[in-house]
């Protein structure tokens, strides 16, 4: 989902740079645009892929193939566990954003299962934003872990700046999708209580 959407975005932006001549076959962007469209047709739509992601997470959670029950209980008490980061850690705020997103995603999954049970798989208006949260969390988490593995001097400063921007973008995406789920699940005082968390 992420790769095909990133490719689609970049090719579309490249086409915009060329303007009307971007569709002329003499320019390489024309074949890129055509190939990208064909890829998306053969791949299937990302909306279906999102339903598959959400359904898989739901199934593995209910069957306890994903050991999240204890994690949900722990995160319900403390959404930001101690990360044991050094004070001079340059990405301390970003690490906290990743963990907050993990807690928020687990919270939304848990509340959705409590509300709908196994019927959640049929609630596409919940499954899609939940899948978006999982995708955003995956991007943030893997990006942060990959950054940690980079040795000093191997473009670490440039990578840090890109990672910061990516985490801000994905955190906002995760948060907004979570709010959509909460607003679908709750109303009135219960909604206000959940939003106060």
Question: Model-derived features: where do they sit?
Answer:
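Alpha-helical interface subdomain recognition
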Residues: 1-197
């Amino acid at each position: 989902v992420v790769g095909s959407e990133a490719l689609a975005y970049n090719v579309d932006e490249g086409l915009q740079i060329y303007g009307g001549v971007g569709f002329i076959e003499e320019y390489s962007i024309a074949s890129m645009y055509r190939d990208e469209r064909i890829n998306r047709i053969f791949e299937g739509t990302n909306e279906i892929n999102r339903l598959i992601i959400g359904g898989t997470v739901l199934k593995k959670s209910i069957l306890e193939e994903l050991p999240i029950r204890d994690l949900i209980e722990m995160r319900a008490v403390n959404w930001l566990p101690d990360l044991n980061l050094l004070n001079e850690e340059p990405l301390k705020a970003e690490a906290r954003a990743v963990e907050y997103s993990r807690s928020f995603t687990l919270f939304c999954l848990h509340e959705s299962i409590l509300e709908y049970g196994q019927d959640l798989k049929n609630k596409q208006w919940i499954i899609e934003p939940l899948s978006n949260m999982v995708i955003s969390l995956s991007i943030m988490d893997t990006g942060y872990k990959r950054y940690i593995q980079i040795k000093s001097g191997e473009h670490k400063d440039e990578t840090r700046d890109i990672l910061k921007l990516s985490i801000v973008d994905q955190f906002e995406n995760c948060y907004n999708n979570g709010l959509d789920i909460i607003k679908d699940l709750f109303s009135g005082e219960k909604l206000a209580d959940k939003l106060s968390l």
